[in-house]
Amino acid sequence: MNEVWLVILPLIAGYLLDLAFGDPRTIPHPVVGFGNMISWAERHFNCGRFRKWKGAVVALSFPLFAGMAGWGITVGTLAVGDWCFCIVASVFVFYGLANHSLIREGREVVDILKKQGVEAGRRRLSWIVGRDTSELSPKGIYTAVLETMAENLSDGVVAPLFYYALGGFPAMMAYKMVNTLDSMIGYKDERYRQFGCMAARLDDVLNYIPARLTALFMALVANRPGLFRFIFRYCHQHASPNSGFPESAMAGILDCRFGGAHVYHGLLVEKPYIGDNDREISYADFRIAVRVNHMVTLLTVVSIVAVYLCVFIK
């Protein structure tokens, strides 16, 4: 089989599996294993002296381990046969994508908000965001869901696909390890400030290009004149060097306002506003965000396939 198809077929199959099923909640998932490894390291090494150095070793060695494990699986399955590799690689691409699950989690929050009220919506939202949700209004809940969908469209969809395009599923898994490290220890509170410093910076570096690609693709699928100007105006109104790009794109598409003051892990964080239309947000906005996420995911997959076919097929 042509090597190009060893990249394209698992990509398409993994995308279709994610589109149909999303992350299975009852089957072992690599990211759960990554999380267990990180929890073990945090318990044993985030103490005493040299926390910053110990955290740096963890942040660099764990992604290397994930990538090497993926490389070993690649070599082993290719030794069996191309179709064996394609099947296994498809499963890892499926595990590496989070679009279906991201939308499912967001829909569960807004559905519970509509059917069971604000308190239930706050509780369900707390499962997927780091901010304190105990005093959020319905508008605040919708805003948090939309911000999360925009940010994770980059972190959970475009970035994994970007690294798959560069290095196959081993690179995709290495990136997922970095992203999991950042989500678990990449905080600025007293507990993680030193230990998680390298993880947070590495995640910022690896998401630099994907975040900007995400905003570009969001602007393309939205087909809204003036959206690029809106993105450039607000993309740096965020503590993260990357999250402002997809969030400003989503705020521009919806003509709404993100940001403001929120409590994270006991600390009040004042976020600059992204957008200036402080309007009410509704379920209709969530449906638009879902459509944008699906279209950006498809556009990313199609772009990778097109590049491989144009560059490597002679």
Please annotate each region the language model reported.
Residues 176:
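Pseudouridine synthase
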